[in-house]
Amino acid sequence: MNIKKQTGLIAAMILLYGNSFGQIKESGSEKSGGGAKPAETYFDLMITTASTNLNYGSSNSALSDYKEPVKGIHAGVSFQAGITSKFSLVSELYYIRKGGELTANNPITTQKTILRLNAFELPVLARFHFGKFYMNAGPSIAYNFSGTRKVDDVSAAISFNNSTNGFKRMDAGVQIGAGYMFPIKQKRLALDIRYCYGLTNISQDQEMFNRGLIISVHFSNPWKKNPLAKNKTT
C-alpha cells in the first residue's frame, strides 16, 4: 500500500471518528435526564496468543503459497472509557510477538525462514455497544524493540537500521473486530476477536507488512471515575 492510500485511509478513519463521536455526544445530550443507562468504564487485563503473518506486497504475490503463520504472546492492559451507553473510546498498551514463516524452496530462498518481532503496541479504538455485543475499530502504532530471523536451525538477531536486511522500529496499522461481554457481578469477562492490518513497510530492502488475528480474553474491573461520560451520576 503506497503512502497516498495509507494517508487517505487514516484520514477517512479520523473523519469517521469525529462524525460518530459528535453524533453520539449530541444523542447523549438529548437523552440526559431521561433515565438513560449510564456509560460503562472498565480497566482490563488481557493475555492470550496471537496468530500473525507477513504480507510481501503485490510484487511478491508468488510467496502466498509458501507462507505460514506463527503464534506469539499477546499480553497487556486495556481501558474502556464510556461516553454513552452505546459508545466508548478504548486505549490499550500491550506486548505482542509478531512475525511470519516462509517454507523451504520458496521463490526467494531454498531455506525455511522464520521472522519474529517483539513489539509494544498502542491501539486507540472506537467501540460501539449493542447490549452485550460490541464492535470496535481504530488505528494503532507499534514499536519493534527486538527481533530474530531463523534460517533453518540457525537464529540471529535482526538489525534496525538503513542497511540491507535491516528493519524499521515504528509500525502503524488499523484494527477491526468484535467482542462479547459476560457480566460477573460488578465485573465482567470479555472475549475479543480482532484483525490487525499493518500499513507500514517494516523492511528496508523489500515489501513486508504485518498481518495478525488476535483472540483475547479480557478480565475487567469497573472504573468509577470517567470525565468523558455524558451521563455522570452526581
Cite the ranges covered by each PLM segment.
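Glycine- and aromatic-enriched membrane insertion/assembly motifs of diderm outer-membrane
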Residues: 44, 62-110, 120
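Outer-membrane beta-barrel channels and translocator barrels
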Residues: 38, 82-86, 130-133, 183-185, ...
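Flexible, solvent-exposed loop segments that connect beta-strands
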Residues: 54-67, 98-118, 145-170, 203-205, ...
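Cleavable N-terminal export/targeting peptides
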Residues: 1-39, 222-234
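Short glycine/proline- and aromatic-enriched beta-strand/turn motifs that initiate or cap beta-hairpins
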Residues: 21-78
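Outer-membrane beta-barrel "beta-signal"
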Residues: 182, 209-234
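Residues on the lipid-exposed face of transmembrane beta-strands in outer-membrane beta-barrel proteins
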Residues: 45-49, 73-83, 93-95, 122-128, ...
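Residues that define the transmembrane beta-barrel architecture of outer-membrane proteins
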Residues: 39-41, 69-73, 116-120, 131, ...
